[in-house]
Amino acid sequence: MTAAYLPSILVPLVGLIFPALSMALLFIYIEKETIA
């Protein structure tokens, strides 16, 4: 039963949090490279 509404939660979660996380990691990586 939970699988019915799981995609409606998972899609926005992946669509918003994954890009934000990758942006943050990329930003930290660039900052470390710049400082080093």
From Swiss-Prot:
Keywords: Chloroplast, Membrane, Photosynthesis, Photosystem I, Plastid, Thylakoid, Transmembrane, Transmembrane helix. It is found in: Plastid, Chloroplast thylakoid membrane. The chain crosses the membrane at residues 9-29. It is a single-pass membrane protein. Its main location: plastid. GO terms for cellular component: chloroplast thylakoid membrane; photosystem I. One of its GO terms (biological process) is photosynthesis. Pfam families: PSI_8 (PF00796). HAMAP family: PSI_PsaI (MF_00431). NCBIfam families: PRK11877.1 (NF008830), PS_I_psaI (TIGR03052). May help in the organization of the PsaL subunit. PANTHER family: PHOTOSYSTEM I REACTION CENTER SUBUNIT VIII, PTHR35775. Belongs to the PsaI family. This is Photosystem I reaction center subunit VIII. It comes from Pyropia yezoensis. The lineage of its organism: Eukaryota, Rhodophyta, Bangiophyceae, Bangiales, Bangiaceae. The gene is psaI.
